[in-house]
């Protein structure tokens, strides 16, 4: 492989890595994106509410409380985020959309995600960001899934498309809040996809080494996250236990029976009660308890099957112990498949790239991603979509404290994605 990653792209990726911001708190990140878009020069630029299409309603999911948003907002301001961008993103309306208009032709879009994870980054001297001085400056947050690289991919591709003989319209979506499956839906329903003929999504790594490209990722599990609150009646645990309605017993029964839901014959189904808690003291019958639940399915219908069964189990557990129960929707994403015509083009382009050492036509994700909202929207409108993997030899898995991206993958991504977009425009499959 020949590698020559431009210095300005490495610098951008490292700046974003130093300043990770979790879902709906990407204030500094959006400001840096706008800086880059204005440097390159685009025909239309939508920021915050304008990118999310809030005139059609606020469809954001899993938005933090105002005090959390305010803390990150002020932190971004202190770190030099632009006041005009802060004004447009205040309240957690992060993200951006750039549009490049270059004459007649199809409308082609690329979607990248921009948020970080609420996770402390390793300070081990063998961890490259720590060793080379771009470890997270935000304790308890890090880019542990490569979204700093994704933003950089997008900027690099935009530069290439602008300088090319591309004919058509190119849209670049910088989507917030993927990690909580909260930002895909509002961007999909923003109206900005209505004229998109072809859409590419991209992810780095996924256990594929640097130099390997997967032309089409499939096997996205549809997912739904929801929170549950049980409310019972407190009582003295020794003197009057019969007077209490035990919310923790309802919780425990719900957990056990959620995991007992029969798996479906038509495909993979999952349930996980990932966060649980309740009670205040050992001598008080617990008045309250909570659980955070996710269900998944190989298709959106199978996810719906698991959701229906889980809700029934939880409601029944609450009834058993005379407790009230309240559900709060947090986030969701449908399943999706990559269209073969686009997979063929990306696979051919990657195979001809001097930066690519190996290709795979397809692979299965086995997880969930809210890029599927955008893919589904384009496909439902008669267009085509595909999700591409750019390999990177990360030392440990995604969502770990020592995750990192080999920066050579930036060059691979920019080359393969930009040339694929040019080829799609030329062929119009």
Per-range role (PLM):
Residues 59, 117-119, 131-142, 148-152, ...:
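Histidine/acidic-residue-rich, glycine-tolerant segments that coordinate divalent metal ions
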Residues 13, 17-20, 41, 162, ...:
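Sec/Tat-exported extracytoplasmic proteins
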Residues 16, 37, 110, 147, ...:
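Divalent metal-coordination and catalytic microenvironments
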Residues 1-142, 166:
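Acidic/His- and Gly-rich active-site-bordering loop/insert found
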Residues 112-114, 224-232, 289, 390-394:
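Short, small-residue-rich loop/turn micro-motifs
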Residues 92, 102-106, 222, 284-289, ...:
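A short, glycine/Asx- and small/polar-enriched loop/turn
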Residues 252-429:
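Metal-dependent amide/peptide-bond hydrolase catalytic core
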